[in-house]
Amino acid sequence: MTIDNRPVLDPRTQWFLQFLKDLGRPQVWEVTVDQARAMQVKGQELFPVTKMPAQVDDRIIPVGPRGTVQIRILRPEGVTGILPVVMYFHGGGWVLGDAGTYDRFLRDITNATGAAVVFVEYRRSPEETFPVPLEECYAAAKWVAEHGAEINVDGSRMAVAGDSAGGNMATVVCHLAKQRGGPRILAQALLYPATANPGYGSQSCRDFGQGYYLTDEAMNWFWRQYVPDAANDTDPTAVPLFAPLDQLKDLPPALIITAECDVLRDEGEAYARNLSQAGVPTTCTRYLGAIHGFMGVNALAETPTAIAATAQMNAMLKKALSDKAAVLPQQSAYV
């Protein structure tokens, strides 16, 4: 008897992929950007989900290369004290995604961790390109660290999190915080992060480039919306996988979650290995039978993998924000 290592998709995931195929929706590059964004919103709304109660506050802060950044602050309902904070940077290929499409997921995080969640509505591509969205994410994190009292959070107890393109920017915000002397970040949670450029040529890209939700063609298109100038394709602030080990040293402890059937799987795991090699406390978990976006897509919210991965992320964030002693001494060097 031989062991069969071929991926087996979760039944709900199989159904979801067939549903999308039967729907016959156009590829993201075949429609206008506004139409693509509307398609994503509709895709989330098609699947009603239970949402945890939360306090929600939208505001505009005076930072960033364009002068202002919009944020949404979520807190557990009825909680009035000063809370630690999770800065959340959303995915969607730098093109799609907003606070509305992430509402269910953000409410889960704030209730499970007991932390406030600050969701950054960075200006999306192609209207704004690298490095503007990244700099807006960094500027928002810096503002929250310095002005936490204005939004009733403890800016000295901050973690960052993000998925896909947002996972890219979440970890690069940690790079910038180290390089620029702050803010202090206690942990980073990266969910199926985009860490390389489309030329990386991984095995997972070859194996899952078609038919598994995020295609290699779509990822190439998303990348060029964010980084239109190929001269930036190896810049570590766009491509964190290419960062030298000394740049990774002393970054915050990391949790990286990958999906087995995802074009971005291998680059996320390669980045985890780089972090570990640089001495960063790193946990990387691959969820079998899962596809890209499985934690945030409403249609997959009740799958065993989404439930387990979300619980793992929330437990890590809660511990990091409640136990300062768990942070290695050298990681306070860029306070």
Predicted feature residues:
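A glycine/proline-hinged amphipathic helix-loop "lid/cap" segment
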Residues: 1-73, 232, 304, 315, ...
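Short beta-strand-to-loop junctions in surface cap/lid or active-site-entrance loops
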Residues: 64-65, 71-82, 241-248
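Short beta-strand element of the alpha/beta-hydrolase
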Residues: 82-92
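Short amphipathic alpha-helix adjacent to the substrate-entry channel of hydrolases
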Residues: 100-119
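Alpha/beta-hydrolase active-site loop
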Residues: 128-150, 313
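Gly/Ser-rich "nucleophile elbow"/oxyanion-hole loop immediately N-terminal to the catalytic nucleophile
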Residues: 145-160, 180
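Alpha/beta hydrolase fold serine-hydrolase catalytic domain that processes acyl esters and thioesters
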Residues: 155-156, 171-335
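Gly/Ala-rich beta-loop-alpha elbow adjacent to hydrolase catalytic centers
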Residues: 162, 166, 170
